[in-house]
Design a protein with these regions (language model features):
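Basic/polar, cationic surfaces and motifs that engage anionic cell-wall
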Residues: 2-17, 32-33, 114, 118-120, ...
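Conserved, mostly hydrophobic/aromatic
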Residues: 41, 123, 141
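N-terminal catalytic cores of peptidoglycan-degrading enzymes
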Residues: 1-114
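Residues immediately flanking
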Residues: 43-44, 125, 161
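Internal catalytic-core helix/loop-beta-alpha segment
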Residues: 92, 120-125
Length: 202
């Protein structure tokens, strides 16, 4: 099936030209010979369920004031990052060069390979597990996936919950896998679950 979504603007190294850039210090080199063939989809909001603030940017750049909100004490000292972050309005931000290893997956495994940070690109959606995502987010997400597939041998898309089952639940039941597949025009084999499941229906 031909892709329905065009890839976003050109690359400059591992930086996507159509994204706004906010470099994070939380990254490292990928292992020699790493095959970047997986896109991992996450959801995040800080504090949980609150949208539009600067807290995700501050977390990914190690500038979050841990005392600003009671929830932040539970993540105090956390150093994480994602390659991309898509806000509710579809605005795309990039924190880490895709040629580098972002710190988004944690303890994880996919198709027999552990440590998914080594060979994946992480994309955070502004949202809360169980909540619906915005049409603009799906459109931007599909464009990023298409762009990644032009630059890297991307073969699969999975949720954080798929690579860390029992430990992570995002992006959650509000994420519609069938909608992403429809936007991309990719075969169902590239996605983590049967697309006729309730949570996967558009």
């Amino acid at each position: 099936m031909a892709p329905k979504t065009e890839a976003l603007a050109a690359w400059s190294g591992g930086w996507l030209g159509s994204a706004r850039h906010c470099p994070s210090p939380n990254f490292g080199p990928r292992p020699a010979g790493a095959l970047i063939d997986l896109v991992v989809i996450h959801s995040i909001s800080l504090p949980p369920g609150e949208y539009g603030g600067p807290e995700v940017f501050e977390l990914f750049t190690n500038r979050l004031d841990w005392d600003r909100h009671p929830y932040f004490d539970a993540i105090r000292g956390l150093e994480v990052s994602s390659h991309f972050y898509i806000r509710r309005d579809g605005t795309l931000w990039q924190f880490v060069d895709c040629d580098a290893r972002a710190w988004h997956a944690g303890r994880s495994s996919w198709r027999g390979r552990d440590n998914c940070n080594d060979d994946s690109v992480g994309i955070e959606l502004e949202g809360l597990e169980g909540d619906e995502f915005e049409p603009a987010q799906y459109q931007t997400l599909a464009g990023v996936c298409a762009a990644l597939a032009e630059r890297y041998p991307v073969a699969y898309v999975a949720g954080h919950s798929d690579i860390a089952p029992g430990r992570k639940n995002d992006p959650g039941t509000g994420f519609h896998w069938a909608r992403l597949r429809s936007e991309l025009g990719w075969p169902s084999e590239r996605f983590p679950r049967p697309l006729n499941e309730t949570a996967g229906k558009a």
